């Protein structure tokens, strides 16, 4: 996206702020706007009729959320929760559609974003059949580290903070694992020296080794 287009997009809609744990969008709601995240981290969670909550995705600054329901004119399929202080722009879908019509480079950027999300979803479906539970968890951690990780000063470029705060239940949801299986596998990855764990914090000890173990290519576009 060209700089001028990006600047114009950041001027669309109305600015809004959210404190941690506040819902930006609510599952089932029929509102017709999207949110452009300008700072902070959010989680997308879906609740099944059984009451089970599943983490679907993590989104950061520069991401759109709520676009599926807005474009399709259907109820929201998930709830978006602030993980930190979050700032965003509320953009009505008709205004966004008009903006994208005026700016083909922005349309291409949105299509690339949606394609990346579809690739992520497709990989999780393939992983469910193609890999054992340990590898599946490692692949989720590896791809999260590629997208969000923050290098640590003591790591010579190999050691990094995962970049998002996730519970073990949320990691299990992303990998399609039972909680006890995810806990055992996370302990195994810790014993292998690939990760370190503290309360709701995961450090990747050696990113190249984790990518190799997880069979994830280093130039993953997600």
What are these regions (language model features)?
Residues 21, 32-45, 60-62:
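Glycine- and acidic-residue-biased ligand/ion/polar-headgroup-sensing regions
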Residues 24-29:
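Short phosphate-coordinating micro-motif centered on Lys-Gly-acidic
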Residues 41, 85-87, 201:
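Structural motif
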Residues 49-56:
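Short alpha-helix-to-loop micro-motif enriched in aromatics/charged/Gly
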Residues 57-120:
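Cyclic-nucleotide recognition modules
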Residues 133, 144-222:
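Phosphate-/nucleic-acid-contacting segments
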Residues 134-138:
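Short, leucine-enriched amphipathic alpha-helices that occur as contiguous helical runs
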């Amino acid at each position: 996206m060209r700089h001028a287009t990006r600047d114009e997009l950041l001027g669309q809609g109305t600015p809004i702020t959210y404190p941690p744990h506040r819902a930006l969008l609510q599952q089932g709601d029929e509102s017709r706007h999207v949110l452009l995240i300008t700072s902070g981290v959010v989680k997308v969670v879906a609740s099944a009729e059984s009451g089970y909550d599943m983490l679907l995705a993590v989104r950061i600054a520069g991401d759109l959320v709520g676009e599926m329901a807005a474009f399709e004119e259907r109820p929201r399929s998930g709830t978006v929760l602030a993980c930190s202080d979050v700032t965003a722009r509320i953009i009505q879908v008709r205004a966004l559609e008009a903006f994208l019509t005026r700016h083909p480079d922005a349309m291409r950027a949105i299509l690339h974003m949606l394609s990346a999300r579809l690739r992520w979803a497709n990989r999780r479906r393939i992983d469910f059949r193609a890999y054992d539970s340990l590898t599946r968890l490692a692949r989720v951690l590896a791809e999260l580290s590629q997208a969000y990780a923050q290098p640590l000063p003591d790591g010579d470029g190999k050691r990094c903070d995962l970049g998002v705060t996730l519970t073990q239940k949320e990691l299990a949801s992303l990998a399609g694992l039972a909680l006890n299986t995810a806990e055992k596998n996370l302990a195994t990855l810790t014993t292998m020296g690939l990760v370190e764990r503290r309360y709701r914090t995961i450090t990747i000890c050696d990113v190249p080794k984790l990518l190799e173990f997880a069979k994830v290519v280093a130039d993953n576009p997600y």
